[in-house]
Amino acid sequence: MKTLICGPMYSGKSTALFQRLERFLFAKKKVLLIRPKKDDRGYFTHSGGIDLDKLEKNNPNFVILTLKDIDESDAKSIANDGFDVVFVDEYFMIPGAHHLCHQDDYDVYFGGLLADSESELFPETIKILPYCDKIKKLNGVCIKCGSELGNYSFAAFDKKEKIVVGDTKYECLCHKCYKEAQHEKKINKEAE
């Protein structure tokens, strides 16, 4: 089974991944967590309290890999290593993560943003969506008005900037506040 857990920042994607990961460890399954090399936040979820290094050290069925990208041979190697389930945190930052979809030897849970600040799907999102048996879309909370159904915005920053997970320039906004921010950004750009 292939599952995608997506949503805006601060919606609980990594926490949802971890809850599922814990269940598999409790069931004594062999679990692999793949994290992107680009993610240097130093924590797994905003809610804290999760020490992945300690969990890996104390559990012989749990392995963490930090990867820059994934190719087809990596996906096959994971199958050969006997993993029952693979979790990919911030999948959109790992080119080739979609290769994991082509293996039937293990279940895969992808977690991360669905789209960029302009609501354009990430290339990896486009490649994994057709293979996902389940898609769980989580909602965030708008940092401006507090409503649910978050969207994405770089506020006053240039779209050309790369998204860095946990970046303070990245905001979770509802559709109304997102449109207002886009309008304000346009006015500021015209004033320059």
Task: Please identify what each model-predicted range represents.
Residues 92-96, 117:
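Catalytic P-loop NTPase motifs of RecA-like helicase/translocase cores
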Residues 1-75, 116-127, 140, 152, ...:
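Conserved P-loop
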Residues 29-30, 107, 134:
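Residues at the starts of beta-strands that form the adenosine-phosphate
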Residues 134-143:
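Conserved AAA+ ATPase "SRH/arginine-finger" region at the nucleotide-binding site
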